[in-house]
């Protein structure tokens, strides 16, 4: 449905903190960024992964080689929640892939992955040896890295030195559903699917900020969500 003009694409480098350099081709937003480089092994579900708040501050590397072939779904909301994404925007810093399919086909697709990245101002590189990159990350653990475009040098950035939970948590109290039971959900970077699952169990969900004092709440349960950053923090 959409075919990218491959001749006009810019080159960029992925530079790891140990000095390793991978060169790739840009298919997203053209801006130098830095963060923590991590890999994930799912074969499908890149719209969900990119919008997962747990990946805030991270440069995401799917191990599956071809990405983009089913495009990006159009947004639709139910009970105040996006049906096909895990939040209202992309949270990862950038996307690194092996092969990019600019042609896409799916009954619910609205745009290409590259178009979506550009709309959200998120860089993406393809043509990277993600197998070699994943092996390095598997051996050394998550590493700091940066995507560098010509003339846009930047420093490495460690997201774990900031309170990134505060950056992804809801700033306001929100309520979902009208179930029999009431659960206070402390939002440390919750995925929408967690809220969807609670709603299916006849639960009214009260979503509160990460630093909310819930000690005086009259409820049937407290749910502490997962989120980005080092769990030890």
Question: What is the role of each PLM region?
Answer:
Residues 5-182, 186-211, 231:
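RNA-binding accessory domains that recognize and position tRNA/RNA substrates
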Residues 212-218:
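Short amphipathic alpha-helix with an adjacent loop that forms part of the alpha/beta core around
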Residues 219-233:
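Cysteine-nucleophile active-site neighborhood
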